[in-house]
Design a protein with these regions (language model features):
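Surface-exposed extracellular loop regions of Gram-negative outer-membrane beta-barrel proteins
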Residues: 58-64, 68
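N-terminal Sec/ER secretory leader and immediately downstream segment
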Residues: 56, 72-73
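Short secondary-structure boundary/capping elements
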Residues: 13, 50-54
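Extracytoplasmic loops and strand-loop junctions of Gram-negative outer membrane beta-barrel proteins
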Residues: 39-41, 70-71, 116-120, 188-191
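Glycine/small-residue-rich hydrophobic helix-like segments
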Residues: 186-222
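Outer-membrane pore/translocation modules
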Residues: 25-36, 48-51, 74-174, 181, ...
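Bacterial Sec-dependent N-terminal signal peptides
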Residues: 1-29, 243, 247
């Protein structure tokens, strides 16, 4: 039943996005996001990582309104581990102070799996399918401080992996801190609860980002620390460094 509801939510968002696109033909497309390389690919749920260097791409495609299509790809350099998802997102509330976003996505997770046949064992890349929904309220204090929460509910579509995932994250954000004439520092301490089927845990996580007013290149440090957990595969402390290229372009359709 939960999988069915998640699918219907994804479908309804997709239909609304298509309808919005048809009603917004005069508005330019906005393409934004970042491309990065990292020493350790960390998942959207930072409990888990690829434990090797990876390529990251997160982006958004919209026409400046409430709907957006947001791809998120995280893969090792050989393409054998990682994941890919396409978010369909809608801003229920989009005001100066308070924002409330909802979203849903289909996703694939790629992992190595040992297979034995005729006495021989080798590793294959297994693709697992998921459908997830999200709720993301946030409140902006000023140009530098904001607070928010994030809830993700994921449903696995196979029996040999996670079936039900609940991720609840409480977020603080401090941005635009000047470091000299051209550089800016942002940091975001967070605490979250994660439940995967019958296992659960509490964690500290966050990131520190260094940007420049004169360059699209940025450097991000991300960390994840256990508070209390019994989740299989969790590490007491995990981290990564990511070198990112940020972009934000507008394109107008020519008839």
């Amino acid at each position: 039943m939960k999988k069915c509801l998640s699918f219907l939510f994804v479908l309804s968002l997709f239909i609304n996005v298509i309808s919005y696109a048809q009603d917004s033909t005069s508005k330019p497309y906005v393409v934004a996001g970042n491309i990065g390389i990292t020493n350790n690919g960390i998942s959207i749920i930072p409990t888990f990582s690829l434990q090797e260097p990876a390529f990251n791409y997160t982006g958004t495609l919209s026409r400046g309104g409430k709907f957006s299509i947001d791809p998120d790809v995280r893969l090792t350099f050989d393409g054998r581990k990682g994941g890919a998802m396409i978010w369909l997102r809608y801003k229920l509330v989009d005001s100066k102070k308070f924002n409330f976003r909802v979203g849903a996505h289909p996703a694939f997770n790629f992992a190595l799996k040992s297979v034995t046949e005729n006495g021989k064992t080798w590793n294959i890349t297994q693709a697992r399918r998921f459908i997830a929904t999200e709720l993301a309220p946030s409140y902006t204090i000023n140009n530098h401080i904001s607070f928010g929460a994030y809830y993700l509910h994921g449903n696995g579509l196979q029996t040999d992996g996670p079936i039900s995932t609940h991720f609840v994250n409480f977020i603080s954000s401090f941005s635009g801190i000047k470091l000299g004439a051209t550089h800016l520092l942002s940091f975001s301490p967070q605490v979250y609860y994660l439940q995967i089927d019958k296992e659960d845990g509490f964690y500290l996580t966050g990131n520190v980002v260094l940007t420049s007013k004169k360059s699209p290149i940025a450097l991000m440090y991300l960390y994840n620390k256990e508070i209390r957990t019994n989740i299989t595969g969790s590490k007491n402390l995990d981290w990564n460094l990511t070198l990112m290229y940020n972009f934000n372009k507008s394109f107008k359709q020519i008839k």
